[in-house]
Amino acid sequence: MLRRGFLSRINAAQWSRQMSVVAKSLKYTQHGEPQEVLQLVEDKLPDPKDNQVLVKILAAPINPADINTIQGKYPVKPKFPAVGGNECVAEVICVGDKVKGFEAGQHVIPLASGLGTWTTHAVYKEDQLLIVSKKVGLAEAATSTVNPTTAYRMLKDFVQLCPGDTVIQNGANSAVGQAVHQLCRAWGINSVGIVRDRPEIAELKQMLQCLGATEVLTEAEIRTSDIFKSGKLKKPRLAFNCVGGKSATEVSRHLDNGGVLVTYGGMSREPVTVATGPLIFKDIAFRGFWMTRWSKENYSSPERSKMFKEIFELMEQGKFVAPNHEMVPLAKFKDAAAAALSFKGFTGKKYILDMSI
């Protein structure tokens, strides 16, 4: 096994010296709308040295935070010229002479944010990467470091949940929402999802229930529902908000005494309004969560390793799938960016750049 890994590094290094790698990257030199500022640029990459790893990107999703970063609306401000994207799954091509934990052919994902993943090839440091089993699907691996981890941490870090407890969330069809449903199913937790009404509401409800949602209600239905008062489900002790405005207020209204509302997004761009009654008489707490901060503070922590291990085990077992998505060729990145900017792109479908097309 050791000899095979050693030969793999030697052969890969020889291949690297014989063939120059030209990366096609989506770069931008100023903030603005992605369709306007992103350019497909070719660059020759250097051979990996020391602790560096050369990878071929296989698939990279377009997340709301990626769009906001390009627009200049996100707290993370990359240096120009910058390559878009934070997530991906890649294949190791070759490694530097001091790399010990990686070899050619392995699948990896980025552990650090802001590396720039909308590119066909890249050179990263070995401590910026995590090996992923090839049993994990490309779409699952490519979308594993933002939405599943956000759902995991919010379910673990704010309220000590037990099987049979209930969680309620708006934006239940978002990528994080879909991840919440699946984790709740795996852990025996009831998951109540709230979505906007739409012509295809029956199909949407069925899709979310297949993922693990216990109940899916529209914003109008939740206002008159008796699922909690009747005792059908326990009152939620934990709520997730990615919409804001009236939707967040309605979600908080259903929390049990001492419940916690966690806000991780604001798609409506309306502020979270705290109702006085629940705040005083039910001692409701309002918290915020940002996965990027948690990852930086826990970069090498055992808890982070445990989280990825659990998520990937569920993926390998077929108990956790990628969000509803569409694979898009890199050449059509402008169409994908425009679609991702739409409300549907934020809540209905994930667009993933397919670097193999």
UniProtKB/Swiss-Prot annotation:
Expressed in the central nervous system. Disulfide bonds: none annotated. Gene3D superfamilies: Medium-chain alcohol dehydrogenases, catalytic domain (3.90.180.10), NAD(P)-binding Rossmann-like Domain (3.40.50.720). NADP(+) binds at residues 147, 173-176, 196-198, 264-267, 289-291, 349-350. GO terms for biological process: ceramide biosynthetic process; fatty acid biosynthetic process; fatty acid metabolic process; intracellular iron ion homeostasis. This is Enoyl-[acyl-carrier-protein] reductase, mitochondrial. Residues 1-19 form a transit peptide. Residues 36-352 form the Enoyl reductase (ER) domain. GO terms for cellular component: membrane; mitochondrion. Disruption phenotype: Larval lethal. Larvae have increased iron levels, which accumulates in brain neuropils. Larvae show increased levels of ceramides and some phospholipids due to dysregulated iron homeostasis. Larval muscles have decreased mitochondrial membrane potential. RNAi-mediated knockdown in neurons produces age-related climbing defects indicative of neurodegeneration. Neurodegeneration phenotypes can be alleviated with drugs that reduce ceramide levels or by reducing dietary iron intake. The active site is at 74 (proton donor). One of its GO terms (molecular function) is enoyl-[acyl-carrier-protein] reductase (NADPH) activity. Catalyzes the NADPH-dependent reduction of trans-2-enoyl thioesters in mitochondrial fatty acid synthesis (fatty acid synthesis type II). Fatty acid chain elongation in mitochondria uses acyl carrier protein (ACP) as an acyl group carrier, but the enzyme accepts both ACP and CoA thioesters as substrates in vitro. Involved in iron homeostasis; affecting Fe-S cluster assembly and ceramide metabolism. Required for proper morphology and bioenergetic functions of mitochondria. Required for maintenance of neurons, including photoreceptor neurons. It is an enzyme of class 1 (oxidoreductase). Its EC number is 1.3.1.104. Belongs to the zinc-containing alcohol dehydrogenase family. Quinone oxidoreductase subfamily. Keywords: Fatty acid biosynthesis, Fatty acid metabolism, Lipid biosynthesis, Lipid metabolism, Mitochondrion, NADP, Oxidoreductase, Transit peptide. It catalyses: a 2,3-saturated acyl-[ACP] + NADP(+) = a (2E)-enoyl-[ACP] + NADPH + H(+).
